[in-house]
Amino acid sequence: MQKSLKSPEYARLIATLVAVRHAAGVRQQVLAKKLGRPQSFIAKYEGGERRIDVVEFIAIARALGADPVKLFRNYVAGKPVKAGRKGRPG
């Protein structure tokens, strides 16, 4: 498997996280603050300049109010992100 910032699989994973952030109505700055990271951390992984690991994926999902296990299952199954109650992914 290709381990690249530009692989279609990785791009889809990042698109999933971006969609969850948008569905939750959370700006990059707010997410960064929740994670205790600079806004550039969010911009870099969303822009494809930086990879995230599984621990970061879990932290990001939780900071956005999403269940990381469900989110990853849906990603693997190729399901699109849907906005649930209060704009949260569900």
PLM region descriptions:
Residues 1-23:
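A short, Lys/Arg-rich alpha-helix, primarily the initiator
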Residues 2, 8, 62, 70-90:
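Short, charged recognition helix plus adjacent turn
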Residues 15-34, 59, 85-88:
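Short basic helix-loop element that most often maps to the first helix and adjoining turn
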Residues 27, 38-41, 53, 67:
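Short coil turns linking two alpha-helices in DNA-binding domains
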Residues 38, 49, 75-79:
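The DNA-recognition helices of helix-turn-helix-type DNA-binding domains
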Residues 49-61:
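Short, basic-rich loop-to-helix N-cap that marks the start of a DNA-contacting helix
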